[in-house]
């Protein structure tokens, strides 16, 4: 949003950093000229000029797929052939209310058409986020499901793209809307599983 962009721009100017514009268009529906213009034109109108980019995630897919495959190879992710209907039916029958029920976690199914890849979220421990605005925020791993990192059509999700790009671009600070707070522990888990070292500092407006 323009609000988040403004806070990023002001932060960068205050601490003499680099303002990087990244277009998160891993979803094919968003990889359209009108979507790009809806991002860049308001920034230009506000005078929020970026130092690098724009970088389009849709043009960096190979990097993300490499990261996903490395997680599978390390046993940190697995193939899943469950569609939404199957998951909802099992949850209804069992009364499970935690989202995905880890049905395929130990099944060792092969890759195939329509098969997704899920991250194997640690069952113990927690993710601690020292949010620059909200202070210490804790997410228990037991409350985070095994989330999808590659869609059934073979494309990676933005969570993987963000982790890879943050590492590649040496991002030190991420300032964004509070609506993305619940995705942050997932990005941090991916960051750690990919052995990227210390993740960026986060601030959720």
Where on the chain are the PLM-derived regions?
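N-terminal Rossmann-like or analogous alpha/beta NTP/dinucleotide-binding catalytic cores
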Residues: 1-94, 153, 182-200
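Active-site cores that bind ATP or allylic diphosphates and position pyrophosphate for catalysis
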Residues: 57, 73-74, 78-204
